[in-house]
Amino acid sequence: MKDRHRILLAPLVPFLLLSCQSAPPAAAPQSAPAATAEKPRKVILISLDGASAQTLHQLHKDGALTAGGFERFFRDGQVADRMLPVNPTITAVNHISLVTGYPPAQTGIVSNTFHPAGAPFLDTVSGFAAPIETETLWESVSRQGKKVGVLGWPGADAKGSRRTADWGILWQSDPEREPALVTLKRSDWSPMPAGAATEGLVTHAPLLRSRAIIGKEGQTGREFEFLAVDRTDDGKVNYDAILPLTAGDRVFIQPGQWAHLPCQVPRRDQIIRSTFCWVKVLSLDPDLGTAQIYFNGQYGNSAYPRTFEMTLGEEGLQWTGQADDHNLGEGWKGHPGIDLTTWTEQTERFTTYLGAALRLAAGRSDWDLILGYMPAIDDAGHELLLTDPAQPGFTTERRDALAAARLKVWQSVDRELNSFLATVDLKTTAVVIVSDHGMAPVHTKIDPNVLLRDKSLLTAGPDFKPAAGTRAYTTTSGGVAEVYVDPAAPDRDRLIADLKTYFSAWSEAGKHPIAQALTRHEGAPLGLDHPNSGDLILFAADGYTFGSGGLKAGHALMPTEVYGMHGYVNTDLRMASIYMAVGAGVKPGKPGANGVVRNVDVAGQVSAWLGLEKPRAKPE
């Protein structure tokens, strides 16, 4: 889901430029899975962001998914060979098409970031927040008298009546308190006087106390006190655990272990909230030469109505947030940060939370349709898809370690699906699992704005963003970039034609990083002929991704900051997404034509299972 360009991978090997491959033409439409006309039933539609059809079928063939979640669909339901995403194969675009049944040319959501037609020339908008020009499933189902719950689905952010269901959980990217890594040296510890906090505490070395201060200055709950404890009676000073001085039972944290500690966090409304914080001891020298303590980012639940948010808290469910990509990247560069194990544990924990929230939601009685969302597989693809020797930092050992971590993430999703299916009555409910796109390895980032600046078409401001005087600029989302030309530019049509020729022919070191440059009209067969689309639409070549940062760095090509990306033309089989269904009204076997389902047919199939008409081309 995340348009993430936040971590820098250690550039252990020079990045290599791979040969360009022209993208094939868009595939012909495939038939939808057969809709039924049976009695209405309930439907649960869950998106596993970034789940590749190729990877799913390979893992199933290898017997690597053993928890029973995915297997239930293969055994009792429908599993498509692949689902054809809409273009571009980007998160916001495909999630909106999944819940509307329309391509970007009709929804108006043409990328994760784009320039909205009619707005001031330099204005851009997030595809996750932009107005949707067609009716969505939550609108359509509500209009027809049914109830809908939405758990984090892109576009359903409750910012206006058209973006609000009957109840739901809202997606949170920004923590109330940022994650923090505290490094304590031997000089940071001092003797702990005897008192109530140490009563009955057994240690075989002097008790020492230290403090960790996290969060923003002036915030409440920033300070944590710890004791260093030696629990081994070996006649040596050998500190082996940290004891947080918090309320409740004593919790000894050894290196490599997490603890769930009582803490206080200031909410965005400045009210102090008593909650629990996840804390991990990353390392602890026996002599306390260095101790590293990591604090997970802190979030509260954001759900509606208020009674549902309270229920989440009563059930002990607390939003944990996605894994800490930034500190993983810092660790990979040799700076203080987290390791791969910690990142994977965070990803598994968030998946567990979302699975528990889905089970709680399905246990409610006030719904006919539930939309759910899990980003773990996408996160692992972006951060861990190290398969190409041309990628920064590639070694076979690192490739294998990251592959093992990606498998663990798939297996954690498998466990949650199995637990979820055990709570659902499949005699009355159809469960549908989809994804928005697959993933491909990348090694080099392209910033097209550098090329436009070099042609004197873009003026960069002090923040290295397009500023006044710019006649052309790009927005980028992975494998796709939109080029916008000022409507007031002299001889505008000729300029667009010249830029098309330039981008199509541009090369570096004999390589062509841009596979295609299409005019908006030429993008019509790809479903992209909408006023929000760029005057030119660029698709990156194999191994390349578009991004920003070049205006500051001073060059158009840079080593990529992530290992996996999407956004390429949907006929690239690596971009193929998944479609699975099981339960009421679902005929076992392969759905679609020749095992292929289209993204834009999902909303209609869900509506048919509900006994309703599909979303309309224009909202009321």
Tell where the protein language model's regions lie, with residue ranges.
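Active-site neighborhoods of enzymes that stabilize oxyanions during catalysis
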Residues: 134, 190-195, 199-290, 299, ...
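Bacterial N-terminal signal peptides that target proteins for export
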Residues: 1-10
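C-terminal motif of bacterial Sec signal peptides marking the signal peptidase cleavage site
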Residues: 17-19
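Short, solvent-exposed turn/loop segments enriched in Gly/Ser/Thr/Pro and often Arg
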Residues: 79-99, 151-160, 373-377, 438, ...
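His/Asp/Glu-rich, glycine-adjacent segments
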Residues: 103-396, 492, 501, 510
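Short, structured active-site-proximal loop/turn typified by the sulfatase FGly-forming signature C/S-X-P-X-R
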Residues: 56-105, 147-149
